[in-house]
Swiss-Prot record:
Low complexity bias (residue ranges): 117-130, 958-972
Name listed for the protein in its UniProt record: Kinesin-like protein KIN-14M
Disulfides per UniProt: none
Keyword tRNA-binding: no
Example of a GO cellular component annotation carried by this entry: microtubule cytoskeleton
Keywords carried by this UniProt record: ATP-binding, Coiled coil, Microtubule, Motor protein, Nucleotide-binding
Length: 1167
């Protein structure tokens, strides 16, 4: 009995210790508050004043704290109110309890923490719920705005809302919605400054949210402590029950022995007594089971409550995180608005300074009245607070009395239980065995519950520690932000002061400048008037001299301008002379260059002669001295190179003796840097730069060729096989300049691509050492840039070509000491340069015949020297005395070149009509190929014996019609019918040349090609006349009987396609159509009559199409120059009538031209 009482006393002591711990926690909070108030310099109070009174010192401290926060808010509201609200929202939270938790604790009748903020008067549950509902409704009535904004509310309404208790009783979600609405209004209105009353309301709402979060955290800690106390209490009760069970089992054993001893005395009485004991035992068992059920139920309720508290805590933490995130977002937006506001405030600062003095007295009087009203309101608030505290004190006293009465009743119950123990021991002894059986199960269940509770406690403790660490971190960040804000505010204040001073000085300076400008303006007007009078007098006195000087200079300038215009219209070859500087080891004291003028004059002095006879004067477009840099050389020719992008053909070549610096001028030194680049690299770089600048209007495509002429053979320097591959030259009257179809064409997109290709070509170029130059160029190199531009707006196509020619130097064999291969190379070089001199002489004499075909070099330069191109020649001169003869020869050659008139160059433009015309021609070419394939297939089907002969005839037709690069001169194709079988026999004479002898044919016909100026319209008319004649002849005669499906339509289509191919070749090929076609047929009348019907029914679509194309070509491409004869014979005379003999034998002979007419036309063309 004594042990059970001791256990109960220990359980009550544990419960009391839990209450004491909660009270101690509350005292610890009060102590921290007093320490913080003392650091802030606020009046303090004693912790006992909260319990015993008086509370006046407490009210004084709270009022002082409020005044200090209000003063801080008023002072910093205009500049950084959002930051203050953010920092105040992150302050250390005060510990209060949540109303929902208070209600749940009231139901469990657990002693409350004295630090809780709710009233402790004994109110019923219904009363509390009605108050809560009323508070929620009042909050919605106050904060729910139907129309308008929070910023439009008056200050009195905001003050009423803040003083009411609706904030304390409002749901947390409603408070969050209020914060979001206020911030959204600020963002939508873009107001940088928050009104003071609205800021106070926002601050109070945020503080209320933080108070609830901190209250919930404190409540969870208190619940943990209470759970520990309850666990100790339950354990003590279990121990008491176990002790009671053990004592009852012993007593039951004793009673059973006594009962056995007395059984013989009174059986009925024993039975009755056993029934009574059994009933008592059952009652005790039910009570014990009830106690166990209550313990389990209490345990489950505690676990449920802890789970609910944990969920509430998580929800509150999530709400706080949302608030912090929203505040950060709003803070960034308000920061941007504040920056704008600062700019506005700077402009409005001057106006506010003016009104500040007048409004100061009014503000002081209003301030005094506001302070009086404020003090009166604070007095009323203090009285209300005192009344509330008194009510709370009375409530605490009444609760204390109730607790004491409850304690007395508990003591009585304990005594009653002790008295009842003796009577229960006998009954408990009977239940010992049953309890022993159930003990294991209950103990297992209790252990599980204890394990769960321990795990839950560990999790909660770990979470609390994490929250404490986060809270410390938040405090640290708040302090850092406060320091940063303070430093920045000081910096901005200093900047504002300096800016105001600067603005004041600038205003003063502007005023001074205005006054000065007015005075200066008057002085300038006066001076202008005086000067105008003086100038008029001076002009009259110097009129004669001025007129004479102006006439002289104007005449001189006009003569120069007219001379340049005449040179441009004549198309003379521009000649620039560059003098090579002396090399190391040469005698620099003696030179052959006597004088270099600024206008292109150069005097060459003969060291062997004195006086005027030893001096020769030359005049060129420009003379560049030895000190001229590569950049200066390029700037002289830069406008000429840029005309390539406008559709002109430009050729620049360097001429001079070996070792005079031609390769240095055109390419630059080996491994040259950008500063030492030659004309080639600089020109290409400039072209790409301009094309990129015009890419919005014109789209350019650039491709590069690089060849060399070595020993009268053309080699591709950019091909895979290096310089071993030999190439042929086509007619040089192409729109793009050079026409070397087998040379590799590389498309390029940047100057770096071209530089890489040129380096490859220079590595493949033939270079050798001679006595005059260690790296002497042994071949003529030609770099050609083909540029095609399309105007994105008009669709006009521009085609230009830039030819950069580096000629090999002329040399004397006795000086260069060339032998073997070098001697052979020198001979070819001198021969080609001699041929170039002959061409220049013929052009200067304006001879009708120019010997372009004498050398491959002149064939390459044919388009530049005698075609539609702007041409410039660099003459490289060696100033050494020993090279006087070569220098004189070079300058004489350059003088002859400068007198060559090429005619004005024209841009290569193609309109949309020409483009469509070429597309139609390409379609006609495709049709030719299809017809040829069909002919070959039909011939293979119909001719079995003469298969090879028919195949050869078909290939000749295909070659002459579709190959644009091979000419077949004077070919004769005769179709004869044999007497026995009617088979086709084809006899071809002077067939077209193949690819192997391609270069030889180019040599034979280069001269004829150079004089070719026949327009495409004349050729198309002759071709159409030929096709009409052929078709008319074939319409009256029978066709081949072995070609049943090749009727009028096919024959007309084939001839029209062949004529189209001749039209499409234009200036590229010289096809001879002087041939005799003899068509024979078998005497098969049925097939002939059927074929004639098909001829009458055949459509004339190809003929009409060809006529339409020819008509369009005549409108677009008719030149103004007189037409010259061509290799095509004119077919204006009708063919001779057929004889009866030819009719009877079925043989038809169509004579297109005689050999005499062909020879006469060819002779006219070459001359």
């Amino acid at each position: 009995m004594s042990s059970a009482a001791a256990d109960r006393r220990r359980a009550e002591a544990g419960t009391g210790s839990a209450a004491a711990a909660a009270a101690a926690a509350g005292e610890g909070d009060v102590g921290r508050f007093l320490a913080a108030a003392e650091r802030m310099g606020l009046p303090g109070f004693s912790p006992s004043d909260l319990d015993t009174g008086p509370v006046s010192s407490v009210v004084t401290c709270l009022l002082a704290l409020r005044d200090q926060f209000v003063s801080h808010d008023v002072g910093g509201l205009s500049c950084s109110l959002p930051e203050k609200v953010m920092m105040q929202s992150m302050e250390f939270p005060r510990k209060e309890n949540d109303p929902g938790t208070q209600n749940s604790e009231g139901r469990r009748k657990i002693p409350k923490n004295p630090a809780m903020s709710e009233p402790s008067s004994p109110l019923s549950q219904t009363t509390l719920s009605s108050i809560s509902r009323h508070a929620g409704h009042s909050f919605h009535d106050v904060f729910q705005l139907r129309q308008g904004r929070y910023s439009d509310l008056p200050s009195s309404k905001i003050s009423e809302m803040m003083k009411s208790t609706s904030l304390d009783n409002a749901p947390t979600q409603s408070l969050l919605s209020v914060v979001n609405v206020i911030l959204d209004e600020l963002v939508e209105t873009k107001i940088g400054e928050i009104p003071y009353h609205l800021a106070c309301l926002l601050r109070k709402v945020i503080l209320e949210i933080e108070r609830r979060i901190s209250t919930q955290a404190e409540h969870i800690r208190n619940q943990n402590n209470l759970m520990k106390a309850r666990e100790e209490k339950y354990k003590s009760r279990i121990r008491v029950l176990e002790a009671l069970a053990s004592g009852t089992s012993d007593q039951t054993h004793v009673n059973s022995n006594a009962t056995n001893g007395k059984a013989h005395v009174s059986p009925d009485h024993a039975v009755h007594q056993m029934k009574m004991e059994k009933d008592k035992t059952e009652d005790k068992k039910r009570l014990a089971e009830k106690d166990v059920v209550l313990l389990v139920k209490d345990k489950e309720e505690d676990v449920t409550r802890l789970t609910k508290d944990k969920e509430d805590m998580a929800k509150l933490l999530k709400d706080k995180e949302d608030i912090i995130r929203l505040m950060k977002e709003k803070e960034e937006m308000v920061w941007m608005m504040r920056e704008k506001e600062n700019m506005v405030s700077l402009n409005n600062g001057r106006v506010e300074d003016k009104h500040q003095l007048t409004d100061k007295d009014v503000a002081n009087s209003a301030k005094y009245r506001n302070e009086i009203i404020k003090l009166m309101k604070e007095k009323e608030d203090s009285n209300d607070t005192i009344m509330k505290l008194n009510i709370e004190l009375e409530a605490m006293k009444s609760s204390y009395e109730g607790t004491r009465i409850l304690l007395d009743s508990k003591k009585k119950e304990v005594l009653q239980l002790l008295m009842d123990k003796e009577s229960i021991e006998y009954i408990v002894s009977q239940l010992k065995q049953e309890l022993a059986i159930e003990r294991s199960s209950h103990q297992t269940h209790i252990q599980e519950l204890e394990t769960r509770a321990f795990q839950a406690n560990n999790k909660l403790e770990q979470r609390i520690k994490e929250m404490e660490l986060m809270l410390e971190d938040s405090k640290t960040r708040v302090r850092d932000l406060e320091e940063l804000l303070e430093s920045r505010s000081q910096i901005w204040e200093q900047k504002e002061i300096r800016l105001n001073q600067f603005i004041g000085l600038q205003i003063q300076n502007i005023q001074d400048l205005r006054l000065s400008s007015v005075s200066i303006r008057h002085e300038i007007l006066h001076c202008q008037k005086r000067w105008s009078e003086e100038i008029c007098d001076l002009g009259q006195s110097l009129k004669v001299l001025t007129n004479a000087a102006e006439n002289y200079h104007a005449t001189l300038e006009e003569n120069r301008k007219l001379f340049n215009e005449v040179q441009e219209l004549k198309g003379n070859i521009r000649v620039h002379c560059r003098i090579r500087p002396f090399l190391p080891g040469e005698d620099q004291t003696s030179t052959t260059i006597e004088y270099v003028g600024d206008n292109g004059e150069l005097i060459l002095a003969n060291p062997a002669k004195r006086g005027k006879e030893g001096h020769k004067l030359f005049k060129f477009n420009k003379v560049l001295g030895p000190s001229a840099s590569q950049d200066e050389v390029f700037k002289e020719i830069q406008p000429l190179i840029r005309s390539v992008l406008d559709g002109y053909n430009v050729c620049i070549f360097a001429y001079g003796q070996t070792g005079s610096g031609k390769t240095y001028t055109m390419t630059g030194p080996e491994n040259a840097t950008e500063k030492d680049w030659g004309v080639n690299y600089r020109a290409l770089n400039d072209l790409f730069h301009i094309s990129r600048s015009r890419r919005d209007t014109v789209m350019y495509k650039v491709s590069v060729q690089m060849i060399e002429i070595y020993n009268e053979q053309i080699h591709d320097l950019l091909g895979n096989s290096g310089s071993e591959k030999k190439l042929g030259i086509l007619n040089a009257s192409q729109p793009n300049g050079l026409a070397v179809p087998d040379a590799t064409m590389h498309p390029v997109n940047s100057s770096s691509d071209v530089i890489e290709l040129m380096r490859t070509g220079l590595e493949n170029r033939s270079v050798g050492a001679t006595a005059l130059n260690e790296r002497s160029s042994r071949s003529h190199s030609v770099v050609t840039m083909h540029i095609q531009g399309v105007d994105l707006k008009t669709g006009v196509t521009l085609r230009g070509a830039l030819h950069l020619v580096d000629l090999a130097g002329s040399e004397r064999v006795d000086r260069s000491a060339a032998t073997g291969d070098r001697l052979k190379e020198a001979q070819h070089i001198n021969k080609s340069l001699s041929a170039l001199g002959d061409v220049i002489f013929s052009l200067s004499q304006k001879n009708a015949h120019v010997p372009y075909r004498n050398s491959k070099l002149t064939q390459v330069l044919q388009n530049s020297l005698g075609g539609n191109a702007k041409t410039l020649m660099f003459v490289q001169v060696n100033p050494d005395v020993s090279s006087y003869a070569e220098t004189l020869s070079t300058l004489k050659f350059a003088d002859r070149v400068s007198g060559v008139e090429l005619g004005a160059a024209k841009a290569n433009k193609e309109g949309k009509d020409i483009k469509e015309f070429k597309e139609q021609l390409s379609l006609l070419k495709d049709k030719i190929a299809k017809k040829d394939e069909e002919i070959s297939r039909l011939q293979l089907q119909s001719h079995n014996t003469p298969r090879a002969t028919a195949k050869r005839a078909d290939s000749l037709l295909k070659h002459s019609s579709s190959s644009p690069g091979i000419s077949s001169l004077g070919s004769k194709i005769q179709h004869r019918r044999t007497a026995s079988g009617g088979r086709i026999k084809i006899v071809g004479s002077r067939a077209g040349s193949d690819v192997d002898n391609f270069s030889d044919i180019s040599d034979r016909h280069s001269e004829a090609g150079s004089m070719q100026s026949v327009d495409d319209i004349q050729q198309s008319r002759e071709i159409m006349g030929l096709s009409k004649l052929s078709m008319s002849e074939m319409g009256h005669n029978s066709v081949d009987p072995e070609l049943p499906c090749f009727g009028y339509d096919d024959s007309e289509g084939r001839l029209s396609d062949i004529s189209d191919s001749g039209l499409s070749m234009g200036a590229e090929t010289d096809c001879s159509m002087s041939s005799v076609v003899e068509l024979t047929s078998l005497p098969d009348q049925d097939r002939v009559s059927g074929t004639q019907k098909e001829q009458h029914m055949a459509p004339s679509t190809p003929k009409d199409r060809l006529h339409k194309v020819a008509t369009r070509a005549s409108r677009t491409t008719t030149p103004k120059t007189p037409q010259s004869p061509t290799l095509w014979p004119k077919l204006r005379d009708p063919p001779p009538p057929r004889s009866p003999i030819s009719t009877s034998t079925g043989k038809v002979r169509v004579t297109q031209a005689t050999s005499s007419s062909r020879n006469s036309s060819t002779q006219k063309r070459w001359t």
